[in-house]
């Protein structure tokens, strides 16, 4: 964001002019979008535990074989690993959302994750379903009008949803 401000100021300075109303309006819109983004990510981060918990409950209600003897989330150790992985994916989705770019999610979280799950015998479709459940919970929290700066947040919510979709597709 500071780069955009610096660029606009440098351009005006090079021309020896004050910032124009169009430039100021553009910067103002960028700040408003940034505030919405900060609010949405703050809401997700503040509710991360409940997002992961509700997604896991929904997943295990839908796929009870995962928590039955022989299931991939059976035993406390495996359940803890499952919840940890869901939390890590949520954390990297929040990084992507604040940056407005999926590269941190791709590079540091998703790259090689499918192969890791395959090597461990973890069903990718179940992981993807869990990610989709997290998406539903996170979007509900982030889109709550008491958590986000007033204004249309549909594009931001669609962007955040796309990061979850990207994560689900990477492990499926």
From Swiss-Prot:
SUPFAM superfamilies: Globin-like. (2R,3E)-phycocyanobilin 1 binds at residue 82. Contains two covalently linked bilin chromophores. Keywords: Antenna complex, Bile pigment, Chloroplast, Chromophore, Electron transport, Membrane, Methylation, Photosynthesis, Phycobilisome, Plastid, Thylakoid, Transport. (2R,3E)-phycocyanobilin 2 binds at residue 153. It is a peripheral membrane protein. It is found in: Plastid, Chloroplast thylakoid membrane. The modification N4-methylasparagine is found at residue 72. GO terms for biological process: photosynthesis. InterPro entries: Globin-like_sf (IPR009050), Phycobilisome_asu/bsu (IPR012128), Phycobilisome_asu/bsu_sf (IPR038719), Phycocyanin_b (IPR006247). Pfam families: Phycobilisome (PF00502). One of its GO terms (cellular component) is chloroplast thylakoid membrane. Light-harvesting photosynthetic bile pigment-protein from the phycobiliprotein complex (phycobilisome, PBS). Phycocyanin is the major phycobiliprotein in the PBS rod. Heterodimer of an alpha and a beta subunit, which further assembles into trimers and the trimers into hexamers. The basic functional unit of phycobiliproteins is a ring-shaped hexamer formed from two back-to-back trimers contacting via the alpha chain subunits. The trimers are composed of alpha/beta subunit heterodimers arranged around a three-fold axis of symmetry. The phycoerythrins also contain a gamma subunit which is located in the center of the hexamer. Belongs to the phycobiliprotein family. This is C-phycocyanin beta chain. It comes from Rhodella violacea. The gene is cpcB.
């Amino acid at each position: 964001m500071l780069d955009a401000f610096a660029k606009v100021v440098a351009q005006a300075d090079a021309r020896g002019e004050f910032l124009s109303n169009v430039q100021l309006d553009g910067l103002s819109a960028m700040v408003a979008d940034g505030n919405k983004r900060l609010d949405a990510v703050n809401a997700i981060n503040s509710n991360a535990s409940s997002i992961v918990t509700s997604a896991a409950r929904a997943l295990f209600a839908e796929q009870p074989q995962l928590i039955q003897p022989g299931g991939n989330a059976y035993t406390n150790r495996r359940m803890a690993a499952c919840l940890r992985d869901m939390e890590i994916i949520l954390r990297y989705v929040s990084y992507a959302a604040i940056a407005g770019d999926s590269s941190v999610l791709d590079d540091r979280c998703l790259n090689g994750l499918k192969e890791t799950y395959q090597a461990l015998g973890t069903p990718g479709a179940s992981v993807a379903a869990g990610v989709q459940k997290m998406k539903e919970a996170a979007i509900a929290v982030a889109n709550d009008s008491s958590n986000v700066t007033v204004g249309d947040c549909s594009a931001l919510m669609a962007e955040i949803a796309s990061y979850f979709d990207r994560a689900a597709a990477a492990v499926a």
